[in-house]
């Protein structure tokens, strides 16, 4: 049975003191017997502290990004080995903001995936279409292409370390809203696309998270869909009470 997962992407928020406070609040309020795997992704400078504070809890810590190279003259970058050395074994790759703001291509993201898997890290692989793609009815093609370019070259065995996170970019901060039915439609398509290439076992085992503005008031309905295995949460992950409601909705 595939894992249910709720991952909180904190983005560029929370200084060191605020990070510690939020983690302590989550430890106090999150259920210890949750059906969901719980992941938080603080900023780079707070990862080591987060790992220490969550050591004896059911909360796992992830990085928001990493560089594809092992080391070298890449000012401002962080490598997989550096993350592993402080106990971070999970990384978010291909996030829509990395693609749009920092111009990360499918090729760059694919290299990052390869590096992370080489270091036996778990990859939360993000992908999804923009508003113009959906308006032009190209959304299925875009999603399939991103999956193919980013993941379809990896070995079957590597899928044990892959979590998929579908981000409908057109429904994030645009005023547009993706319905639970639209989420299910795309998640079903994603699972069938994986099935065609890698078979039913991998397709049924891989967790597919929804990353389209999940909030306390819509989480339970979205998570009730058969191919939605949890969420990649943005703004709502920065408030402990909101995040707890979302986790309880799984």
UniProtKB/Swiss-Prot annotation:
> Which coarse location class describes where this protein primarily resides?
cytoplasm
This protein's species is Flavobacterium psychrophilum (strain ATCC 49511 / DSM 21280 / CIP 103535 / JIP02/86)
- Give, as one word, the top-level EC class: isomerase
**Gene3D superfamilies to which the protein is assigned, alphabetical:** Aldolase class I
Can the keyword Cytoplasm be found in this entry's annotation? yes
The UniProt record lists the keyword Cytoplasm: yes
Question: What HAMAP family does the record tag this protein with?
Answer: TIM_B
A GO biological-process term: gluconeogenesis
- Tell me which SUPFAM superfamilies the record gives: Triosephosphate isomerase (TIM)
Q: Where in the cell is it found?
A: Cytoplasm
Q: What Pfam families does the database record attribute to this sequence? A: TIM
User: What is the E.C. number?
Assistant: 5.3.1.1
Q: In which pathway does it act?
A: Carbohydrate biosynthesis; gluconeogenesis; Carbohydrate degradation; glycolysis; D-glyceraldehyde 3-phosphate from glycerone phosphate: step 1/1
Query: So what family is this one in?
Result: Belongs to the triosephosphate isomerase family.
| Gene Ontology molecular functions | triose-phosphate isomerase activity
Q: Which positions does UniProt annotate for substrate binding? A: 9-11, 173, 213, 234-235
Listed A to Z, the keywords are: Cytoplasm, Gluconeogenesis, Glycolysis, Isomerase
Give the protein's biological function: Involved in the gluconeogenesis. Catalyzes stereospecifically the conversion of dihydroxyacetone phosphate (DHAP) to D-glyceraldehyde-3-phosphate (G3P).
The molecule here is called Triosephosphate isomerase
Q: What catalytic activity is recorded?
A: D-glyceraldehyde 3-phosphate = dihydroxyacetone phosphate
The entry's active site is: 95, 167
- One Gene Ontology cellular component annotation held by this UniProt entry: cytosol
- Can you state the subunit structure given in the record? Homodimer.
């Amino acid at each position: 049975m595939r894992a249910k997962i709720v991952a909180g992407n904190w983005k560029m928020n929370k200084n060191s003191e605020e990070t510690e406070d939020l983690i302590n609040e989550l430890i106090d309020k999150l259920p210890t017997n949750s059906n969901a795997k719980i992941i938080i992704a603080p900023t780079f400078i707070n990862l080591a502290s987060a790992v220490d504070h969550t050591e004896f809890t059911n909360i796992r810590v992830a990085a928001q990004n990493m560089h594809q190279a092992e080391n070298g003259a890449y000012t401002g970058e962080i490598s997989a080995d550096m993350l592993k050395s402080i106990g971070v074994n999970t990384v978010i790759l291909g996030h829509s903001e990395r693609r749009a703001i920092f111009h990360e291509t499918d090729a760059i993201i694919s290299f990052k995936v390869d590096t992370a898997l080489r270091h036996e890290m778990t990859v939360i692989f993000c992908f999804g279409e923009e508003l113009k793609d959906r308006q032009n009815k190209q959304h299925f093609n875009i999603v399939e292409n991103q999956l193919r370019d980013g993941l379809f070259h990896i070995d079957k065995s590597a899928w044990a370390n892959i979590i998929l996170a579908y981000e409908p970019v057109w429904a994030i901060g645009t005023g547009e809203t993706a319905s639970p039915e639209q989420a299910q439609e795309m998640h079903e398509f994603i699972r069938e696309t994986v099935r065609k290439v890698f078979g039913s076992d991998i397709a049924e085992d891989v967790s597919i998270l929804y990353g389209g503005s999940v909030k306390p008031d819509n989480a339970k309905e979205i998570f009730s869909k058969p191919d939605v295995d949890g969420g990649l949460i943005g703004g709502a992950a920065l408030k402990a009470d909101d995040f707890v409601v979302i986790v309880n909705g799984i």
